[in-house]
């Protein structure tokens, strides 16, 4: 059985495979196991077990081996969880998030924004200008919006995530 005690690992697995998938992970024995056996011991439908295993495989958190039955010719998939890969998978997720935040930071720094006085939406200067500084949703006026707070928050988040990667 694979115990997932680390709250960060637990949250990550929940994000990937949900509650039932987490139950499947925790029910996995140390040795290889078939998806049918997992469905049997967890009481979770075979389709859900397979979906969860494939999601784990896509994130490199599970591996499988195919074995052909010599009599029937059918393939049997034997699955195994790779809990040692959780940290590297989380690290990859953090790197992706940092890249997205850097792209958002560039966007925020490269544009001037105008916001609807009624809170409908926020527009870049070009869009606001095309609409004569009038909100296309409510016809309210669009006023200049200072985004330095947004920039600071993004920069701080990037700094925190980068520090977490280094530790």
Curated annotation (Swiss-Prot):
Keywords: DNA-binding, Transcription, Transcription regulation. It comes from the Archaea. Coiled coil: none annotated. Residues 5-87 form the HTH TFE/IIEalpha-type domain. GO terms for molecular function: DNA binding. The keyword Transcription applies. GO terms for biological process: regulation of DNA-templated transcription; transcription initiation at RNA polymerase II promoter. InterPro entries: TF_E_archaea, TFIIE/TFIIEa_HTH, TFIIE_asu, TFIIEa/SarR/Rpc3_HTH_dom, WH-like_DNA-bd_sf, WH_DNA-bd_sf. Disulfide bonds: none annotated. Monomer. Interaction with RNA polymerase subunits RpoF and RpoE is necessary for Tfe stimulatory transcription activity. Able to interact with Tbp and RNA polymerase in the absence of DNA promoter. Interacts both with the preinitiation and elongation complexes. Belongs to the TFE family. NCBIfam families: transcription factor E. Transcription factor that plays a role in the activation of archaeal genes transcribed by RNA polymerase. Facilitates transcription initiation by enhancing TATA-box recognition by TATA-box-binding protein (Tbp), and transcription factor B (Tfb) and RNA polymerase recruitment. Not absolutely required for transcription in vitro, but particularly important in cases where Tbp or Tfb function is not optimal. It dynamically alters the nucleic acid-binding properties of RNA polymerases by stabilizing the initiation complex and destabilizing elongation complexes. The winged helix domain is involved in binding to DNA in the preinitiation complex. This is Transcription factor E. It comes from Methanothrix thermoacetophila (strain DSM 6194 / JCM 14653 / NBRC 101360 / PT) (Methanosaeta thermophila). The lineage of its organism: Archaea, Methanobacteriati, Methanobacteriota, Stenosarchaea group, Methanomicrobia.
């Amino acid at each position: 059985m694979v115990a997932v005690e680390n709250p960060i690992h637990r949250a990550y697995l929940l994000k990937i495979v949900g509650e039932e998938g987490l139950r499947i992970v925790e029910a996995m024995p140390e040795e290889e196991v078939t998806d049918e056996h997992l469905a049997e011991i967890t009481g979770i439908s075979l389709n859900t077990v397979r979906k969860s295993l494939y999601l784990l495989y896509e994130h490199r958190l599970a591996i499988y081996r195919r074995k052909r039955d010599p009599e029937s010719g059918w393939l049997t998939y034997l699955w195994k969880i790779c809990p040692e890969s959780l940290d590297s998978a989380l690290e990859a997720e953090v790197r992706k998030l940092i890249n997205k935040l850097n792209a958002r930071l560039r966007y925020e720094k490269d544009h001037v924004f105008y916001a609807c006085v009624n809170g409908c939406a926020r527009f870049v200067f070009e869009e606001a200008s095309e609409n004569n500084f009038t909100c296309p949703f409510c016809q309210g006026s669009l006023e200049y919006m200072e985004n330095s707070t947004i920039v600071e928050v993004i920069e701080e988040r990037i700094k925190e995530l980068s520090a977490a990667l280094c530790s």
